């Protein structure tokens, strides 16, 4: 693995951290309720200033996920180029769609604020939701697909990763984040609003750790 591939892993880790910070600003509330995709009442607990900060941080950082997925795919590549290329294409497409999703959250949130202030915008909120929520479902479906590739490739033992890394697939980690929230744990309240980013922070961190002795300078 070249130093360049390793650098892209750090970029992926940085993306997960920044988008996670932005999404935390956009969606975290100590009262929970982030699962409400009809009325989005939890947005009333979040100030317009915090929403604006989260919007810009997350949207500007989200495209860096594509670089991070290139890092993961290059570490899977020794196990088979076709599947590693499919892993990258699916992951990159998913996070391009995910950027569109997170870029619309600010506008949904401010519409909720206007409704709370007395504006008759319920139909507009419904329209926003109908054109926003499908994007995150595409992202979640993509996580299932890349996780299948992840498990298959790593389990064969020919990638840059040790076989135990197969356990830490994005889908399994994401399911763990959801379980922590819906089982009412204290940590779940914090990780659920940023579940996708917390998942990938773990994936990129483990990738960098598991391949830490493999970096070399490329002379090609």
Task: For each feature predicted by the language model, list its residue ranges.
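Hydrophobic, aromatic-enriched alpha-helical segments typical of multi-pass transmembrane helices
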Residues: 1-220
């Amino acid at each position: 693995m070249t130093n360049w591939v390793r650098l892209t892993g750090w970029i992926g880790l940085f993306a997960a951290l920044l988008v996670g910070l932005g999404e935390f600003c956009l969606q975290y509330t100590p009262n929970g309720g982030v699962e409400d995709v009809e009325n989005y009442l939890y947005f009333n607990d979040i100030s317009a200033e915090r929403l604006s900060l989260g919007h810009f941080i997350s949207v500007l950082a989200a495209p860096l996920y594509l670089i991070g997925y290139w890092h993961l795919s290059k570490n899977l590549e020794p196990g088979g180029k076709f599947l590693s290329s499919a892993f990258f294409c699916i992951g990159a497409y998913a996070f391009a769609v995910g950027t569109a999703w997170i870029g619309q959250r600010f506008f949904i949130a401010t519409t909720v604020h206007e409704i709370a202030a007395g504006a008759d915008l319920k139909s507009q909120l419904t329209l926003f939701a109908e054109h926003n929520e499908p994007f995150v479902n595409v992202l979640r479906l993509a996580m299932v697909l890349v996780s299948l590739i992840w498990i298959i490739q790593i389990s064969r033992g020919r990638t840059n990763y040790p076989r135990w890394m197969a356990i830490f697939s994005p889908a399994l980690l994401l399911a763990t984040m959801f379980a922590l929230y819906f089982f009412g744990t204290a940590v779940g309240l914090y990780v659920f609003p940023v579940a996708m980013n917390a998942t990938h922070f773990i994936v990129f961190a483990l990738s960098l750790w598991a391949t830490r002795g493999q970096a070399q300078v490329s002379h090609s």
